[in-house]
């Protein structure tokens, strides 16, 4: 659809489809179609053209149905070889190559065209298609993709609609290329040996000249690829002048686009040795703990041992996936040499970028606008980037803010590209406290920067005015500029909405260049339909993007995560377009980095330990987990396909070989994997037009099997022929047989609320349903199929976002993550028992198990944190009096724990402050959010009591630096950790009082108990500071609840006192008789 042509809204279920045009705008006049004597091709909409004799080209001699020569030749070679109107088989015309089934011809005046496909400007499979004013040459590589496409729709192109109806250009080569796809069979003509070979043109002078020309071209090509195998050269190739430079460029272009940078062995080997030693020490430690119970405090001892065993298992699940950490390095210059050479059409893959937002009051439109602006200004060919914004709250505020953003982008994007600034989100660029004149050499930069800053400030004022206007909702609902009622006034009951703001025919920037396509999408919502929150919105974006642009790769970001590096897409393509990695890589995950966090990162918002240690460790196994944002996907992986694995990938790993020995027969899992690969190859076979099947087209012997294949695809992907056709375009781009006029209705259809019914969406395809943390589940399903993922961590962070620095918001965020993990733990997709028939590696499975079981650690953790207070109150302890031999185990255990942590910091580069903050928040979250998540998850799964999904507030600091850090917001999550703090403080006072009253001999055991209790309080210290706030004042409600719970607990303990026997109680009360 044309940009700025108006919003499209509708519902497939209600048979509604309307176009709401901007106020005062009239429908744009249609461009006059190119024609010759009124003849326009009814397949592609191009000129029919003329024949070799100068007459109008007539493809069908029976009905003269207007078809141009390129479409005629394509139908003969790749299609059904019949006229679309009368179904008469096409005959060969002079100048066209022969295809199988053509009648024998005695005349030999056209043998060149009869036997061979011409290159360059010739007509044939590498014909030139004139489209939108430019020539595009389809190579055999792109034809190889086309012949797999189901020809489900056809029609004439409508001016002003989606222009890229041809396969995306990154699969198109220039006409001078002699590239031939080896997977495409060469046309063969059967030669009758009884005839003279000269009659076929063989051994003639022309034939010999063609053979000589072919050999010369092959020799030239061999010279170009000679540098690929340097060991095969007899000596160094001495190239001088431009020829030598060209050879060097070709050699550089064939080098890998990335490489693995291993951790230095002197760091990694010592780290592994300490892990093994720690495991051995743990075995001796538990042997001592189990065989030496505390007789007078058996309950305390038993609880402590159970907790310690669980902590050890948790450590194993967390530690071993970090066994083989790696770093990666990309080469953007090699990517440019191979796919994006200057002066040549870019061969980079098309990418669709998804931005998701729900509530503009919690996710300010200005933040979303900055994210969109950073995407539109990215360093990537504009015709290869499309930005889709999902508004799942159907807010008119988001729509109007996006309209203002599109207008400001016309000025902002050329400014960014002209002066090469970073980052390209204006709010964060102008807020940088750096020397912005560094490395700037253009005298006009200062003046233009000052003018652009003023433009941005005016843009902010307009956005703020929209936000202020949205605070008061009219009683009759919102209305658009032309007086039409806003279709999304009811966020739970509204039609689907689509608006294209930028892109083709959407206007140019201030420098006269095109901008990337910007599309607003709000999926249909109706009562009685399950919408699956963010996962459902992302799946709707997959489908609508496949219909409109169909980028080969997808990148999703949250609305508050802007592009901090304009090279982010190129960084991802260094892996996705690498011949060795791309075919088996499902996604490239980038680390999350944040702005606006306090200097000391009180609540571990940066999560450095996870992103810089755990994720690097997973990258050395099967790849990092998907974290929900900043991730570039292979579209085929989201469609549920298996990866293209090599024989080496399918071989049993070295552990299996060493344990089981060599085997002559292939393992069952190996054969199953090969069978799945074969099934995937078969599923890529062409799917044909249903109408053609019904009419009995020649060449298909089993029509029923084709029909069943079509029904299987509809059951899998839904009933959208255009979308199904797009799934076969593995290199991206719109199927050439698609009618652009039908794209609007089809886009509305695929985002309708009932489209996913009785399909595999959310089960095997797209983002997987069943958890509020759909990211973990989606990545797990891909890894279980055998895909690998890549962790890309360039020196400059590619994405930055905002994090909740307020204590209550942070705990609510952690609660949502933990609740999602509990839901997965109690589902059929639990990594403990799911996916054993797939290709998921053992250590990768351990990492996923750790990801879903960590909330359960909150139960033993909170029990262990209360134990010090109980010991101080009862004058008991969890450990008996130990000898020097037993004390050695405790010393070695603590030493191994610290050694492991220090060595991790050494090879990862993480600071000790970040490590300590992570340890502190592990206790804070474990005693609050994780504990609540366990019980809420049980209620949701077992009792069906659902909890509300709350969007984390992303409002900016407007009252000063880190003002939000000191704001207190009441939540029940604060009660458990506050209770633990009060109990430990009370226990310390009671223990010290008891030691003072009992004399000197009580101080020795007291120190161990006090150290235990102080250790708990130190971990909860950031939480205590958060309770105090800026005024060092804790809310009364928290104090009352915590003291009440602590008092009740203490009184009950004194009353029950489970460690005193009935006889001792009787003695204490003076009730003992003579038999005592």
Swiss-Prot record:
Ranges that cross the membrane: 268-288, 297-317, 852-872, 885-905, 921-941, 972-992, 1004-1024, 1034-1054
Q: Which GO terms describe its molecular function?
A: cellulose synthase (UDP-forming) activity; cellulose synthase activity; zinc ion binding
Chain sites annotated for binding Mn(2+): 534, 558
Cofactor(s) essential for the protein? Mn(2+); Zn(2+)
Q: What does this protein do?
A: Probable catalytic subunit of cellulose synthase terminal complexes ('rosettes'), required for beta-1,4-glucan microfibril crystallization, a major mechanism of the cell wall formation.
The Swiss-Prot or TrEMBL record describes its family as follows:
Belongs to the glycosyltransferase 2 family. Plant cellulose synthase subfamily.
Name of this chain's protein: Probable cellulose synthase A catalytic subunit 1 [UDP-forming]
Give the source species. Oryza sativa subsp. japonica (Rice)
